[in-house]
Swiss-Prot record:
The keyword Cytoplasm does not apply. Disulfide bonds join C126-C206. Receptor for neuropeptide Y and peptide YY. It is a multi-pass membrane protein. Its main location: membrane. This is Neuropeptide Y receptor type 2.
Length: 384
């Protein structure tokens, strides 16, 4: 899985002509401004056009601005307001940290690389930027999977105890540790070098460099394995979990107005989390599909607008980094109240969870028996 700005580059096995295609667009064998004998002027790739670059600058800057503000706000309210410090919200804050990493460390350099056509940010960032984006995406995927499994365990099986806050911190730490290990090839197998396109003209390249004689096959294996393990499989688990949760909530009959209100809160929270997963899956699908096409058929690299297509799909994928805070504010009243309180610089958030605490504080565990059948009894906790 080739993450970030360097995913649009070919590997170290490219010929000079192929590197020239990357730099100046398909069909070019001369420097910009020069014409081959008896040839017509050729259009360089669209990312070199000023109007396209303006659109790309606006798109990336908007994503960065919205992402930094929104994700910082999510982290702030979870840390500041005690009533927001629930296990689910800790996982949501972890998603925000991962997205913030992409917004601040990856996207500015992605934009710079796209506009300049070569890597001008030095060898350290050559290794760090693709690694950071791969790390963040993998952390997000693991966290979304953990949230789905936790809610499935509590709602479908009516378990009395949820994950404790201490265990949630351990899970978050493990998510970052496992992701750091899985993303490490993106930093290790990379080379920062000068490549001579034509005599007396060099560009700075940051390319994949896999070991062994069959270098290309290792990159393909890693890319396909990452796609399966960190996209297809987790989304399968998440889809299964939320399908069962949705079925359980839809078919449940609540005996009493108080519990019915609590049940509705769970439905709303589940809807919000499902939307987060859908946005993540849909936004990343075009980029994953396009990269899969490249891995299967390298001739895709010969497309005239390959770089523009990759960049557009990358922008779509990055929209997920600012969409989550918008979903929280739109679909969850607790986050909406917390955001407003943060803007007003309020120190407390007394209103939050008030409807839950008043009704259920005296009934931390509510035993419900449906149709007087012992097999239908279950226990609900108040932490939504």
């Amino acid at each position: 899985m080739k993450m970030g700005p360097l995913g649009a580059e070919a590997d170290e096995n490219q010929t000079v002509e192929e590197m020239k295609v990357d730099q100046f667009g398909p069909g070019h064998t001369t420097l910009p401004g020069e014409l081959a004998p008896d040839s017509e002027p050729e259009l360089i790739d669209s990312t070199k056009l000023i109007e396209v670059q303006v659109v790309l600058i606006l798109a990336y800057c908007s994503i960065i601005l919205l992402g930094v503000i929104g994700n910082s706000l999510v982290i702030h309210v979870v840390i500041k307001f005690k009533s927001m410090r629930t296990v689910t919200n800790f996982f949501i804050a972890n998603l925000a940290v991962a997205d913030l990493l992409v917004n601040t460390l990856c996207l500015p350099f992605t934009l710079t690389y796209t506009l300049m056509g070569e890597w001008k940010m030095g060898p350290v960032l050559c290794h760090l930027v693709p690694y950071a984006q791969g790390l963040a995406v993998q952390v997000s995927t693991i966290t979304l999977t953990v949230i789905a499994l936790d809610r499935h365990r509590c709602i479908v099986y009516h378990l009395e105890s949820k994950i404790s806050k201490q265990i949630s911190f351990l899970i978050i730490g493990l998510a970052w540790g496992v992701s750091a290990l899985l993303a490490s090839p993106l930093a290790i197998f990379r080379e920062y070098s000068l490549i001579e396109i034509i005599p007396d003209f060099e560009i700075v390249a940051c390319t994949e460099k896999w070991p062994g004689e069959e270098k290309g096959i290792y990159g393909t294996i890693y890319s396909l394995s990452s796609l399966l393990i960190l996209y297809v499989l987790p989304l399968g688990i998440i889809s299964f979990s939320y399908t069962r949760i949705w079925s359980k909530l839809k078919n449940h009959v609540s005996p009493g107005a108080a519990h019915d209100h609590y049940h509705q809160r769970r439905q709303k929270t589940t809807k919000m989390l499902v939307c987060v997963v859908v946005v993540f899956a849909v936004s990343w699908l075009p980029l994953h599909a396009f990269q899969l096409a490249v891995d299967i058929d390298s001739h895709v690299l010969d497309l005239k607008e390959y770089k523009l297509i990759f960049t557009v799909f990358h922008i779509i994928a990055m929209c997920s980094t600012f969409a989550n805070p918008l979903l929280y504010g739109w679909m969850n009243s607790n986050y909406r109240k917390a955001f407003l309180s943060a803007f007003r610089c309020e120190q407390r958030l007394d209103a939050i969870h008030s409807e839950v605490s008043v009704t259920f504080k005296a009934k931390k565990h509510l035993q419900v028996t449906k149709n007087n059948g012992p097999n239908d009894s279950f226990t609900e906790t108040t932490n939504v």
